[in-house]
């Protein structure tokens, strides 16, 4: 399960039906891989529950990432799960990629030891506040330029805004050709389908590093392109 922080579609599941996943895993004898790299970037507390927190018989393997909360260049994640399964993963890594960068592993290890749990959570709070400010700036720009052209929900976590373009059945050409010509970098929704060739009316916008002025200009240009396409 990887929802990229877009928990607006997960609210009901988190509140009422998250137990269904582990229950189905027990009933039909399968494992759950919970891919949740944006978990620590939730904008409200208490944080949403995880499948791992509900696991009672070792069926959940959870993946997290330091790349989203420390530095994107680190490219290091970590697994949490039952020891027999993690041991098999370790054996696989030893005969494939060997391991991630030793230097970056040492950096993270030393940093976490120096911070401790309290220091780590204080860092998370600062990161979340940064992304909350970025999200709010993007929502202002979206409301200004896309209000009558698209639909979206305020993201509850992460660094992306998931936008549905009204009247456009497939955003591939709009984003990968016309938007690029206007120096607007977005990702067409089809990239997130199981079959990426299937049409999608969605677009993903990142608010990780853009300034409010850049967001405003990008959505103005996107609005003009949408109007031309309709």
Residue ranges and their predicted role:
Residues 1-230:
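PLP-dependent class I/II
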């Amino acid at each position: 399960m990887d929802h990229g922080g877009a928990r607006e579609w997960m609210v009901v599941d988190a509140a009422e039906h998250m137990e269904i996943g582990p229950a189905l895993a027990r009933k039909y004898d399968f494992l759950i891989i919970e891919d949740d790299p944006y978990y620590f970037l939730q904008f409200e507390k208490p944080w949403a529950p995880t499948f791992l927190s509900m696991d009672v018989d070792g069926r959940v393997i959870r993946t997290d990432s330091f790349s989203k909360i420390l530095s994107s260049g680190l490219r290091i994640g970590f697994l949490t799960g039952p020891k027999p399964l993690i041991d098999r993963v370790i054996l696989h890594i030893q005969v494939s990629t060997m391991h991630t960068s030793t230097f970056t592993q040492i950096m993270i290890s030393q940093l976490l030891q120096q911070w401790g749990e309290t220091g780590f959570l204080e860092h998370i709070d600062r990161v979340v506040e940064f992304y909350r400010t970025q999200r709010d700036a993007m929502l202002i720009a979206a409301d200004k330029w896309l209000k009558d052209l698209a639909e979206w929900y305020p993201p509850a976590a992460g660094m992306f805004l998931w936008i549905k373009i009204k009247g456009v059945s497939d955003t591939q050409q709009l984003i990968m050709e016309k938007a690029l010509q206007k120096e607007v970098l977005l990702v067409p929704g089809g990239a997130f389908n199981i079959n990426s060739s299937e049409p999608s009316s969605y677009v993903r916008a990142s608010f990780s590093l853009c300034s409010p002025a850049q967001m405003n200009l990008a959505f103005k240009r996107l609005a003009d392109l949408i109007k031309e396409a309709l």
